[in-house]
Regions:
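Noncatalytic, basic helical substrate-engagement surface that gates or grips nucleic-acid strands
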Residues: 2-14, 18-164, 191
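Short, structured coil/loop segments at alpha-helix boundaries
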Residues: 85-87, 93, 111-117, 121-126, ...
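Non-catalytic nucleic-acid-binding/docking modules located in mid-to-C-terminal regions
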Residues: 3, 9, 13-20, 201-350
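Solvent-exposed, flexible loop/coil residues
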Residues: 13, 23, 43, 91, ...
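Aromatic side chains
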Residues: 33-35, 80, 106, 175, ...
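Residue-level signature of catalytic and energy-coupling elements of molecular machines
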Residues: 27, 78, 174, 246, ...
Length: 350
């Protein structure tokens, strides 16, 4: 879910052309959940093959990522979640309960023919299984798209990659990567049209956004440490926050007092959890530093075999996606040869 900072975060609306030639560290689980939530039949049922294996996420990966790569030259590196942090277990249990309730409501609405309600409940019931995740990794490998396995939270790993200059921005809908220190965050990169909000039962138009961490900190007159404290007051995936304290109130507290400890006890009777552990989760997260970011060649036969023979995709549509990626490889190869012959240096993708 991520920390709800929208009311106080300065965002810049961008277009996909603004990401031309950039390398993005993609929060894989976040993106796959969105594909699973939105790529569905009118009654809310996910796309599946004849054996009942879900393919919605593979559809999203194949067609939306290849479009970004072919039309805009954007390089994508997918970062997958590892073992959930201990502090996140309570939040994950809440999510399981919400999904279970939504699943029951979806089945009831679908049985009654109320497809509008069924779709909304189906979105909230989305679950990314281990098999789905492994299928996604397999497809990405066949496409030559790199994956990095984070030891814990993918957004922390992606933030490190951007901070080190190996990627230009983190791609995720959540703001957590800012708390982890990502210099830049882009939202809604892989989605088009409208986003459905299950909690409100409505949808909103998707506008791609760029958030610059330093601009956010300067605009709020906060340090990154104070921004983390602000988030802890509001509530994160690691803690519940303080009842009645939203982003604007938390910002007021941080500007006035500077830290949670400095807030008077008559204003804040008790802190929102173990502050040392919570701060460490964001300021010193578990990451791997010896990752490899390598963009490989596409295994065309492997892509066709996996998607068409095993998962029963339309050969025509798969062929279209494959041709798009082949055109990207051809253009890059031609550019590299020209650069080599002319002594020019290519622009860094990050």
């Amino acid at each position: 879910m991520g920390v709800p900072l929208t009311p106080i975060i300065k965002r810049k609306v961008i277009s996909l052309s603004d990401l031309r030639g950039r390398t993005l560290a993609v929060d894989a689980n976040n993106v796959l959940y969105q594909f699973l939530a939105l790529i569905r039949k009118p009654d809310g049922s996910p796309l599946t093959d004849s054996e009942g294996r879900v393919t919605s996420h593979l559809v999203g990966l194949l067609f939306r990522t290849t479009r970004l790569m072919s039309e805009y030259g954007t390089r994508l590196a997918f970062v997958f979640d590892g073992k959930p942090p201990r502090l996140k277990r309570a939040e994950l249990e809440k999510r399981r309960e919400v999904r279970a309730k939504a699943l029951a409501q979806w089945k009831e609405a679908k049985a009654s023919g109320d497809y509008a309600t069924a779709f909304s409940k189906a979105v909230a019931s989305s679950k990314l299984s281990l098999q789905m995740s492994e299928d996604a990794k397999r497809l990405l490998s066949l496409l030559g798209v790199p994956q990095i396995q984070a030891p814990s939270d993918a957004e922390a790993q992606a933030a490190l990659m951007v901070a080190r200059g190996d990627a230009w921005a983190v791609a995720s809908q959540d703001y957590d990567s800012l708390l982890y220190g990502a210099p830049r965050l882009v939202r809604y990169v892989t989605l088009t049209g409208r986003e459905f909000l299950p909690s409100k039962g409505e949808s909103k138009r998707l506008l791609r956004e760029l958030i610059d961490l330093q601009s956010v900190l300067d605009g709020l007159n906060l340090s990154r440490e104070s921004l983390v404290d602000l988030a802890l007051l509001v509530g994160t995936d690691f803690n519940d926050g303080v009842l009645g304290v939203g982003p604007k109130t938390a910002l007021k507290f941080m500007r006035q007092y500077g830290s949670i400890e400095a807030i008077p006890s008559n204003v804040l009777p008790r802190p929102p959890g173990d502050l040392d552990s919570l701060r460490k989760a964001f300021l010193d997260p578990e990451v791997v530093r010896d990752y490899r970011l390598e963009f490989g060649d596409m295994d065309e036969e492997g892509v066709v075999s996996f998607l068409c023979k095993e998962r029963e995709f339309s050969p025509q549509r798969v062929d279209e996606a494959v041709k798009r990626l082949k055109s990207v490889r051809a253009r890059r190869s031609a550019l590299t040869k020209w650069m080599d012959s002319s002594g020019q240096k290519p622009r860094p993708f990050r």
